[in-house]
UniProtKB/Swiss-Prot annotation:
It is an enzyme of class 6 (ligase). This is Glycine--tRNA ligase. ATP binds at residues 177-179, 187-192, 262-263, 308-311. Gene3D superfamilies: Anticodon-binding domain, Bira Bifunctional Protein, Domain 2. It comes from Borrelia garinii subsp. bavariensis (strain ATCC BAA-2496 / DSM 23469 / PBi) (Borreliella bavariensis). Coiled coil: none annotated. The gene is glyQS. PANTHER family: DNA POLYMERASE SUBUNIT GAMMA-2, MITOCHONDRIAL, GLYCYL-TRNA SYNTHETASE/DNA POLYMERASE SUBUNIT GAMMA-2. Belongs to the class-II aminoacyl-tRNA synthetase family. CDD domains: GlyRS-like_core, GlyRS_anticodon.
Amino acid sequence: MVRMEDIISLAKRKGFVFQSSEVYGGLSGAWDYGPLGVELKKNIKSEWWKSMVYLHENIVGLDSAIFMRPEIWRASGHIDGFSDSMVDCKDCKSRFRADFIDLSKNCPNCKVGNNFTSPRSFNLMFKTHIGVVEDSSSEIYLRPETAQGIFVNFRNVLDSSRLKIPFGIAQVGKAFRNEIVTKNFIFRTCEFEQMEMQFFVHPKQIDEWFCYWQQNRMNFFIETLKIRPDKLRFKAHDSTQLAHYAKSAFDIEYEFPFGFQEVEGIHNRGNYDLTQHSKFSNNPKIFEYHDLLTKERYVPHVIETSAGLTRSVLMTLCNAYSEEELSDGDKRIVLRLHPKLAPYKIAIFPLVKKVELVEIARRIYIELCDDFHIFYDDSGTIGKRYRRQDEIGTPYCVTVDYSTIEDETVTVRERNNMTQKRIFINDLYSYIKTEILNYKEDFNK
């Protein structure tokens, strides 16, 4: 069983995630992504973008501003309705989301009897000011979701891209929520990244497309990110759990070390958002769709897929982490990342730091670095270098040895099963490409 302390230790030690502002004592719930973290995050984002935009001819991309006019958040219902209920323990002063604890039992922190304040509403949006004068006219918000930037650009995208219903708009970007409690490492934070797609459909086709996107998104986690199927599940929202904009919703949950938690939501938003913006902007035609074939005019309904990029990073680390007992009694830590997600695809080693071996290793690096992100390492024993790459998920290690000088072959060592093959240098590119393309994960290991 994977433990969170092992994931956190690896993430910090190897440069996936660092505590933000650490030299000043750190900032609770804020994290910086290190050299390996930014690569893993970029690779997940790239696979998501490919699955949404490149593999669907009727989905296009958008990158909307973080700052938007406050009227947008008034129309969307976030100013009045985007809040959580919170309570405080009167004894230890700890603060909790009311829906995260049993108020009839002892405080989870101090274990004293149920001595809580009455639940009170807490708006999750960060408010700030824009301009030189701080008054009500200059109030502005950090966006709590990326979706509204898509909705207010509905007409711009529709007209400029010459799209027809059904179509989607995809976006990856940062969102901000003043969470009552930040916890579980990078899982719940005030600053995070979302991967969202809003799919606009005819009202009569909403159920059909909702089912399609449910299955499509589950397949993405299993087939593309190679998440263990037994660690994933659907969870339906009941009426008390629905967001103010949703008619129905399903979460895709992953079994983290701290239990099953949401990594993506699929929501039937109906025509709530477009209708609200048509009312508040006094411009209903902008949010209306005119079908030239049927002559029908209507406000499209929306299916939303909303995944947490930062949560997906944590899920991927938990899913890939393993510890193995070797035949010599030693322990090996391995990140079994899909090669497409691995921060480095290849590590290149000269067996020893001799000029003739280093020159060949450097030549291979230069020949392949346009196509693969490569780590070069010539220090330490070859065994230790292998172990270092296993820990960060590098799928293939290429070793240049004395035989290379004679026959232009190198040793390619595979991460998961540690098998080694001799490959001609001229065949390295095609060999690695084929291996990545045909990669299969054995979920029984």
